Amino acid sequence: MRARTLALWLALALPTIGAESGTEPKFRLAPSPDLNEPGKKKASDEVQQIATRALAAMTKGDLEKAKKDFLKVLEQVPDNVPTMINLGLLEYRKKNFGEAERRLESAVRLAPDSGLGWLIMGVVQYDQNKFDHALASLAQAAVLEPKNATVHHYFGVTLGQKGWYSGAEDEMRKALELDPNYAEAHFNLSVFYLQRNPPAVELARRHYQRALELGAAPDPDVARSLTPPQP
């Protein structure tokens, strides 16, 4: 890419209040509203109400109140995996990456088949530049959630950070097969096409334009790379 590697758009969209339709990225990761787990005793109505209150606080951005209520849930239902995952996501939003990873590690240790737990842990590890760990977590998420476009997107971005662009392209295409309107995946696939030697400019342009149509912000580096050189 003309001796320059473009920044990848790894967008983690979380619930916001008052967002107008079409002005926010499609929500990709959100807290789990259900405490119940297969093969375990059903959570009481009282505990579920506390969890619902925590989710409402988290959606409003009151992370401290949400955390207090999530911890109350764990007092009543120790080792509840959905709550551990929610706490991991909450700590991620607070940028407490170490604590987020600790919560998520506990969750996937108790429920190794939790695709959501592996996905969020992979994103947390990615944001700490722990790309090898992120690859392992996201690969596990992809095995557990093969029909999840978000998993393939984040897995592809992480492969791209390692310089494995062919695999990254494959994962972006899988994401788009599952969700053709995934703006971030279109954007990142355009970036990966520009990493080819020679760059696949027309393919990149097609996906970049589609990303813009779907609400992605214009990127001057990508736009310059798609502009034919002046004679």
Where in this protein do the model-derived segments appear?
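Terminal, low-structured helical/coil segments at or just beyond the last alpha-helical repeat
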Residues: 23-38, 191-231
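Alpha-helical segment of the N-proximal tetratricopeptide repeat
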Residues: 43-79, 89, 93
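Helix-start (N-cap) detector for alpha-helical repeat units in TPR-like alpha-solenoids
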Residues: 47, 81-82, 115-116, 149-150, ...
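Structural signature of tandem alpha-helical TPR/SEL1-like repeats
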Residues: 59-69, 93-106, 127-140, 162-174, ...
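Structural marker of alpha-solenoid helical repeat scaffolds
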Residues: 76, 110, 144, 178, ...
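Canonical tetratricopeptide repeat
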Residues: 86, 120, 154, 188, ...
